[in-house]
Amino acid sequence: MKRTYQPHNTPRKRTHGFRTRMKTKNGRKVISARRAKGRKRLSV
């Protein structure tokens, strides 16, 4: 049986990357929430 997670960097960046997050209002919310929490990595 094939597993569901088949990692690839391109789709990963496209969906969860910093630039992608900054494109939308909600994405910017995500980044700011992670900044406020003090996350070491804000995005992928």
Swiss-Prot record:
Residue segments, region Disordered: 1-44
Keyword Transferase among record annotations: no
Protein family per UniProt: Belongs to the bacterial ribosomal protein bL34 family.
Keyword Ribosomal protein: yes
NCBIfam families attached to this UniProt entry: rpmH_bact
GO MF terms, alphabetically ordered: structural constituent of ribosome
InterPro entries: Ribosomal_bL34, Ribosomal_bL34_CS
Entry keywords, A to Z: Ribonucleoprotein, Ribosomal protein
Example GO BP: translation
Name of the featured protein: Large ribosomal subunit protein bL34
GO cellular component: ribonucleoprotein complex; ribosome
Any matching Pfam family: Ribosomal_L34
